[in-house]
């Protein structure tokens, strides 16, 4: 059992509601637009793809805080979980990443952590690995009460920060 599920079990011993991802957030995939490499100018705004920033461009199509999940290409980690990126500010996202925006009742940062624990190995298809929109929308999300989500995010963000600090000190 991973840490997030341990925390859910600890804080919600009677269980939590399980929802499909599409019921937990706003999915913005229809607003994505690819930009050819030749059309990109290395300027101000991050241009995101399946596994993070690919380049920089002169304009943006999103402004806010988002979770990006790889759709095709480099979409799965060695442990079988999705490639997930936290993105803030003015950004452009191509058609190789799913885009999640917060919806009332489920914290975006909670989804960021939770999605990283889901084994999607059986959902990845094709010669070029792909997590289809249909499969992505149907991912099952354990949704504890907001106060529990806040505590889980606090614990996991603290752990992430400590891990980064230790890694920096060791290198």
What are these regions (language model features)?
Residues 1, 15-17, 137-171:
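Amphipathic alpha-helical segments
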Residues 1-4, 24:
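Functional cation/ligand-contacting sites centered on basic and imidazole/sulfhydryl donors
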Residues 5-11, 33-35, 125-128, 138-143, ...:
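Short, recurring structural edge motifs at helix starts
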Residues 8-32, 38-47:
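Non-catalytic DNA-recognition/assembly elements of restriction-modification systems
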Residues 26, 63, 116-120, 158:
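Short, intrinsically disordered, mixed-charge
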Residues 29-33, 53, 120:
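Generic structural signal for secondary-structure transition and capping sites
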Residues 43, 90, 169-171:
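Short amphipathic alpha-helical linker/capping segments at the junctions of internal repeats
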Residues 49-51, 57-116, 125-127, 132:
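A short beta-sheet element
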């Amino acid at each position: 059992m991973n840490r997030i599920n341990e925390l859910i079990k600890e804080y919600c011993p009677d269980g939590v509601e399980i929802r499909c991802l599409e019921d937990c957030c706003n999915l913005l995939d229809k607003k994505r637009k690819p930009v050819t490499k030749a059309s990109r100018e290395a300027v101000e705004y991050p241009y995101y793809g399946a596994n993070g920033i690919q380049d920089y461009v002169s304009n943006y199509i999103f402004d806010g805080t988002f979770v990006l999940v790889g759709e095709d290409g480099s979409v799965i980690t060695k442990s079988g979980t999705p490639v997930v990126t936290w993105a803030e500010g003015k950004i452009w996202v191509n058609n190789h990443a799913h885009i999640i925006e917060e919806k009332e009742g489920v914290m975006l940062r909670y989804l960021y952590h939770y999605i990283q624990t889901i084994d999607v190995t059986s959902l990845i298809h094709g010669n070029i690995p792909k997590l289809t929109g249909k499969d992505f929308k149907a991912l099952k999300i354990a949704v504890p009460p907001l106060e529990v989500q806040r505590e889980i995010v606090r614990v996991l963000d603290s752990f992430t920060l400590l891990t980064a600090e230790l890694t920096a000190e060791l290198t």
